[in-house]
């Protein structure tokens, strides 16, 4: 894939609009390919609707360059037994491979950090796969490892 240099001054970060679906979807599919998952279209459609439903604590923000979406971040707020205020969980972060290495991922994380501050969140956290070494370089630069190890158990 060919790299594209972008002028960071031309990058705008903003909440996704409902009309951004067609531009967001290819990046969402690429994100799934990266993680070797195939999320059903019904879940994708439901997720997109949740981003815009007033009672849902799920959000999507996009990075745009010259009107084109080049990255996204999904985040949500949830209660914690460890704090009075909500935690903010950054669930998904993806930047178009053609524009990686230009701090767009960092800007998207900082966008979520700002939203968490506005909501007086007690914590902002996220996970990544142990094989996502490029992502870990960014995360080690902007945050600290918590020392927590994640376990999963099937419920079906």
Give the location of each predicted region.
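Conserved acetyl-CoA pyrophosphate-binding loop and the N-cap/start of the following alpha-helix
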Residues: 99, 103-111
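Conserved GNAT acetyl-CoA-binding A-motif
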Residues: 117-127
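A conserved beta-turn-beta hairpin within the catalytic core of GNAT-like acetyltransferases
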Residues: 78-90, 100, 146-147
């Amino acid at each position: 894939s060919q790299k594209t240099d972008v002028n960071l001054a031309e990058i705008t970060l903003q909440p996704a609009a409902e009309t951004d679906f067609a531009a967001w979807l290819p990046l969402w599919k690429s994100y799934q390919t990266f993680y070797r998952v195939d999320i059903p279209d019904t879940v994708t459609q439901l997720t997109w609707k949740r981003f815009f439903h007033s009672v849902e604590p799920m959000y999507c923000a996009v990075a745009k360059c010259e009107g084109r979406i080049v990255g996204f971040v999904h985040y949500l707020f949830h209660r914690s037994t460890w704090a009075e205020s909500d935690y903010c969980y950054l669930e998904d972060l993806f930047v178009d491979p053609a524009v990686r290495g230009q701090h767009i991922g960092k800007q998207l994380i900082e966008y979520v950090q700002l939203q968490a501050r506005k909501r007086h969140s007690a914590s902002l956290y996220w996970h990544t796969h142990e094989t996502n070494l490029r992502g870990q370089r960014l995360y080690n630069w902007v945050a600290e490892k918590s020392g927590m190890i994640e376990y999963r158990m099937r419920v079906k």
